Amino acid sequence: MNKRLRHSKMKIAICGKMCSGKSTLANTLKIIDDRYTIYSLGQAVKDIGTNLFGMKEKDRDLLIQIGTKMREIDPDVWTKYLMEKTKYETHCIIDDMRYQNEYDILKENGFVFIQLHVSRHIQEQRLKKLYPKDFQRHLEKREHLSEKNEYVWSEGKEPVITIDNAESANIVIHRLHSFLQKNENDQMSIPLI
C-alpha cells in the first residue's frame, strides 16, 4: 500500500493593476482555506515609509520612490526578502506581484499565479472610493511600470486562473473553490516513495 501525501502545499502569487482586487482575492482565498498566510512584497516598502518617513496615509509617490531606490541597489531585494520569510511555508499567498523579475523568482520557488484584470472605469471608481481625498494622485500612477500587469509567462507557468472584474463574486468564489480542491486532489494522488 502506497503512503499518500497527508498535507498538500501551494504557494500563490496574485498580480493585477491597482484596485483590481488583489488583496480582496487573497483574503477570500484565506477565508476558503485558513491554512494560508498572506504576504505582500510591498509591505516592507510601506513599513519603511511609515517608520522612516512618517507616512500616515498611503503615499503612492513616496512608496514608488522607496521601492525604486531599493531596486537600484538590488532589483530582487523585495522578492528575496519574501522568499526568505516564506521558505518554510506550505500555504502562502503573495498578494501584489508587479514586476517580471518577481514573477521569475516566484516561478523558480514553486509559486502558481492568479492574474486579475480590471477595466479603467472600474479601477477609477474603486480609486475614488478608496482614496476620496487624493484619488487623482493614484490615477496619475496608472501608467507606471508597476501597473502594467504584463508578463512574459514561461510555458507551463502561466496563470492558473485569470479573473476579469466583470465576473460576479459568486462565480469567482466557485472557481477558487474548484481550483483549490483540484490542487488538493492532485497532490493526494501522488504516492510517496
Which sequence ranges carry the predicted segments?
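P-loop (Walker A) phosphate-binding loop of NTP-binding proteins
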Residues: 17
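Conserved lysine of the Walker
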Residues: 22
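Hydrophobic positions on the alpha1 helix immediately C-terminal to the Walker A/P-loop
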Residues: 25
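ATP-dependent NMP and nucleoside kinases share a basic, alpha-helical "lid"
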Residues: 32, 37, 83-131
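Small-molecule kinase domains that catalyze NTP-dependent phosphoryl transfer to phosphate-bearing small molecules
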Residues: 77, 82, 107, 116-193
